[in-house]
Amino acid sequence: DNSSITTDQGANVLRISAQKSNSGSYTSAKLTTKNFVSVRFRRVDVRAKMTSGKGLWPAIWMLGNNIKDISWPGCGEIDIAEMLGHEPNKMYATLHYTNGENKHEEVQGSKELSDIKFSDAYHVFSVDWDHEKITFLLDNTQVNQVPIAADMKEFLRSFYLILNVAV
């Protein structure tokens, strides 16, 4: 069921929305490039207007292609931009991985806008990734930069892109 995904052909807009069902529960959607397009050591830009509201969790993120073989967080996760709906002016950029002791580790940066919400206007959320570091950007301004350490081997492999709104 793709009813939570709509397009506006004239503006090249793809909209993911949360919808309340007759039973009172909510549904949303997830778009993924898994099995179609994967990237490694590239820059990825996504122009988006994020949703806001209590209980919503919009995200632009990537998972390692080998998630079926290694599982999370061993496959690695690159959160280009995540928001919590009750914090409409704050975005998070995070890496999740398995450290040298085989435990979940994360490195997180964030950016808070002082005068507007991420749902008020379109922004470009980016990750610029090479074999030495991963840089997160908002509207071409650096939010966080993480060197790829020896125990972060996940980030030397290919990843696929995911766009979603969790409820």
Region locations from a protein language model:
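GH16 jelly-roll
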Residues: 1-167
